[in-house]
């Protein structure tokens, strides 16, 4: 007999096929193109209903993973009495798992079986008694949502999409703030040009405009909340002798409107920066401790997600953000870039020019470890201890390269070695006095001088003998060389004579 195992949102269904070799049919699509043909071919043999939505989700996950659950195993044991029966299964993994159970089935799962499943799924409500099309569609929708939630394992605190959008908005805000501030300084500069040189901060400049208005009111206006006392005095003095033109109230109203936008944007930027910092500490605490919130957020945004960044090797993280320079270098066969977005990290910034590349490489390696812990660790805390340890190691390496202590993370306190105290030695005054030389000592000195003279004479004699031997050896070598050369000349002469005789003989024979 041939059975078809069908997984539905309501439960497992075993359909009995009237044709034993239906999976070998060449005209399968034509044989199952209508509901009558499908109902004639398949009859329900057994049905195992799911008890709840949670049970349905559990069984669906086991099918996806290619595992045989206890509920499915019980269903298959009911029909194992039929000898030499064939079981048609949709998933290859599931077919392999059923084979391992040791049941008397010939399990089949190939491309042809997909056509059978296509026909069964189309007319499933008619095959299952007591199940309407509407009920099955509702169950399928609910199960699909459950599987989706299970796969995503959704957690609002761990969504890295928020980081990607926040860092993009932060960059846009910086550009807008710079543009607005430049426009405001140029606009108000016609009325009070000296103010831009005294006050360089854009937000403080905008707040002064909103508080003071026209420059003639500078002496009456209190700017102590915005500026230090010294700079406030300079502003008021410059306002009295300013070379700027006069402006109307309408002009001032429009300038004030722009200044309000700058102050509001600056306040929102600070709020967004705090939000991004909190999000980064929740999602990637170790990366945040190592490279900072902004650099970490830019790395995540550039790669697309925290998971894809965690899967990247250290070499990719090192040059992330410098793709154009990398491909240009490869094309022109020049040196490849040493760093990308990591250049803006504080640790790389502390290094001198020659050491920036080395520190970027070390930092990228540590960042890869921290990222994998942040993204893939099952049980992790948000303290960022691994990031702090990695940062301490990078700082130690930086200190070694720079030759000075650049560590900012707290040092490990170790116990000092115990020092044993010993008694001070007394000074020996007798060591400073020299004894008078005795007669025996003078005699021994004479004997030593005689020995030295004898040694020198012997050494000279040996040197003379060595020089004679070397001359003799050189002469023998020269004689051998001359004899060899004479012998070679003689052999060459004999060969030449033989060759000439041979050639003469050949000529005579030809004649």
Curated annotation (Swiss-Prot):
Main location: nucleus
Record carries keyword Lyase: no
InterPro entries recorded: Nop56/Nop58 (IPR045056), NOP58/56_N (IPR012974), Nop_C (IPR042239), Nop_dom (IPR002687), Nop_dom_sf (IPR036070), NOSIC (IPR012976)
Region Disordered, annotated ranges: 423-511
A Pfam family hit: Nop
Keywords from the named record: Coiled coil, Isopeptide bond, Nucleus, Ribonucleoprotein, Ribosome biogenesis, rRNA processing, Ubl conjugation
Cysteine disulfide links: none
Places the protein is found: Nucleus, Nucleolus
Cellular component terms per the entry's GO annotation: 90S preribosome; box C/D methylation guide snoRNP complex; nucleolus; nucleoplasm; small-subunit processome
Recorded GO MF terms: mRNA binding; snoRNA binding; snRNA binding
Boundaries of every Nop domain copy: 283-403
Biased composition annotated in UniProt, kind: Acidic residues: 440-450
Basic residues bias locations: 471-511
Keyword set includes Manganese: no
A GO biological process held by the record: maturation of SSU-rRNA
Cited function: Required for pre-18S rRNA processing. May bind microtubules.
Miscellaneous comment as given in the Swiss-Prot or TrEMBL entry: Present with 34700 molecules/cell in log phase SD medium.
Protein name in UniProt: Nucleolar protein 58
Organism: Saccharomyces cerevisiae (strain ATCC 204508 / S288c) (Baker's yeast)
Gene name of the record: NOP58
């Amino acid at each position: 007999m041939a059975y078809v195992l069908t997984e539905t949102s309501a439960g497992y269904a075993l359909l009995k096929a009237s044709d034993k070799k239906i999976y070998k049919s060449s005209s399968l699509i034509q044989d199952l193109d209508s509901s009558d043909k499908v109902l004639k071919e398949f009859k329900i043999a057994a049905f195992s209903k799911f008890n709840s939505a949670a049970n349905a989700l559990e069984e669906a996950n086991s099918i996806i993973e290619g595992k045989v659950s206890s509920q499915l195993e019980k269903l298959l044991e009911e029909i194992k009495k039929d000898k030499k029966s064939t079981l048609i299964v949709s998933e290859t993994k599931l077919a392999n798992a059923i084979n391992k159970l040791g049941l008397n089935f010939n399990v089949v799962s190939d491309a042809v079986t997909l056509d059978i499943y296509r026909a069964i799924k189309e007319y499933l409500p008619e095959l299952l008694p007591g199940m309407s099309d509407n009920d099955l569609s509702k169950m399928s929708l609910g199960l699909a949502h459950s599987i989706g939630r299970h796969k995503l394992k959704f957690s609002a605190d761990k969504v890295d999409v928020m980081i990607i959008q926040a860092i993009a908005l932060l960059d846009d805000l910086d550009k807008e703030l710079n543009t607005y501030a430049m426009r405001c300084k140029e606009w108000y500069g016609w009325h009070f040009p000296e103010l831009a040189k005294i006050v360089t901060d854009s937000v403080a400049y905008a707040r002064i405009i909103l508080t003071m208005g026209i420059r003639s009111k500078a002496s009456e206006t209190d700017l102590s909340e915005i500026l230090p006392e010294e700079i406030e005095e300079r502003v008021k003095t410059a306002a009295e002798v300013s070379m700027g033109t006069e402006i109307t109230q309408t002009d001032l109203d429009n300038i004030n409107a722009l200044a309000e936008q700058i102050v509001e944007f600056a306040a929102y930027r600070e709020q967004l920066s705090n939000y991004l910092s909190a999000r980064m500490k929740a999602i990637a605490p170790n990366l945040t401790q190592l490279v900072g919130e902004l650099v970490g957020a830019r790395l995540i945004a550039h790669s697309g997600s925290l998971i894809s960044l965690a899967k990247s090797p250290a070499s990719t993280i090192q040059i992330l953000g410098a793709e154009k320079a990398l491909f240009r270098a490869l094309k022109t066969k020049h040196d490849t870039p040493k760093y990308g977005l990591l250049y803006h990290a504080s640790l790389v910034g502390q290094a001198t020019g020659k050491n920036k590349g080395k520190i970027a490489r070390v930092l990228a390696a540590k960042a890869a470890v921290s990222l994998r812990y942040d993204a893939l660790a099952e049980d992790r805390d948000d303290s960022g201890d691994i990031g702090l340890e990695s940062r301490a190691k990078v700082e130690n390496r930086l200190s070694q390269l720079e030759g000075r202590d650049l560590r900012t993370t707290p040092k490990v306190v170790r116990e000092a070695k115990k020092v044993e105290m010993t008694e001070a030695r007394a000074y020996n005054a007798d060591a400073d006095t020299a004894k008078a030389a005795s007669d025996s000592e003078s005699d021994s000195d004479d004997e030593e001088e005689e020995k030295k003279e004898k040694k020198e004479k012997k050494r000279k004699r040996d040197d003379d003998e060595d020089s004679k031997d070397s001359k003799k050896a050189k002469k023998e070598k020269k004689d051998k060389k001359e004899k060899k050369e004479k012998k070679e000349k003689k052999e060459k002469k004999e060969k030449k004579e033989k060759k000439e005789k041979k050639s003469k003989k050949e000529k005579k024979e030809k004649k």
